């Protein structure tokens, strides 16, 4: 009898791009073949406001927390919150830094992103991450025209994690929710220099993800997870994409990396056609 994989949430917080952290997290998670990690990636955590956004999501979807953060105050706040909700919180660099310090006999020179050096590619990715975080979930609509890629779709179609993945590769990415009855921002329709892509998924996948999400009092869990409602939302999203000739990617059976690979291909063709 085939056993079902156990799913869990893996939260990864970094004060830089998070590449080191993501590599370690995925390497460890891959050793547990009977488990499937749902990744939540939070790059550029450098102040309490940015941390609080991550903590809110960790509170809603508890799991394993990994981090690479230098600021002591931020680390203490993170650890205290994780202790309060009784979930593991691991600083993946701490034991390595201590080993170096002990062997070399010299103090650690703690600098954010020290491993990257000051090169143009690094600054490009940092700029893309800043832009992407600022333009998550329909925020800052007035500067959508500065995006390289804009992802649109209904709730829980992997818009945010895909945006972060693209930003880590230097692509300024915004994402805008498609909600029946809510007008699209004029700046979205006016973003002629950005590639706009619709993300969809199966009704079953979206319903499952939404059922696992702990919603606030302002939401009706029943209507949010109802398959008929989700089907209507998807129909609306498909019609919008068809009306404006936006390409659509079905993420149902795609990993974030696979979705991003298709987006890179579409972006290459889009830029060639300009």
From Swiss-Prot:
EC number: 2.7.11.32, 2.7.4.27
Keywords, in A-Z order: Kinase, Nucleotide-binding, Serine/threonine-protein kinase, Transferase
Family annotation (InterPro entries): Kinase-pyrophosphorylase, PPDK_reg
Binding residues annotated for ADP, in chain numbering: 153-160
Entry keyword Transferase: yes
Catalytic reactions on record: N(tele)-phospho-L-histidyl/L-threonyl-[pyruvate, phosphate dikinase] + ADP = N(tele)-phospho-L-histidyl/O-phospho-L-threonyl-[pyruvate, phosphate dikinase] + AMP + H(+); N(tele)-phospho-L-histidyl/O-phospho-L-threonyl-[pyruvate, phosphate dikinase] + phosphate + H(+) = N(tele)-phospho-L-histidyl/L-threonyl-[pyruvate, phosphate dikinase] + diphosphate
GO molecular function term, any single one: ATP binding
Family, per entry: Belongs to the pyruvate, phosphate/water dikinase regulatory protein family. PDRP subfamily.
Function summary: Bifunctional serine/threonine kinase and phosphorylase involved in the regulation of the pyruvate, phosphate dikinase (PPDK) by catalyzing its phosphorylation/dephosphorylation.
Protein name: Putative pyruvate, phosphate dikinase regulatory protein
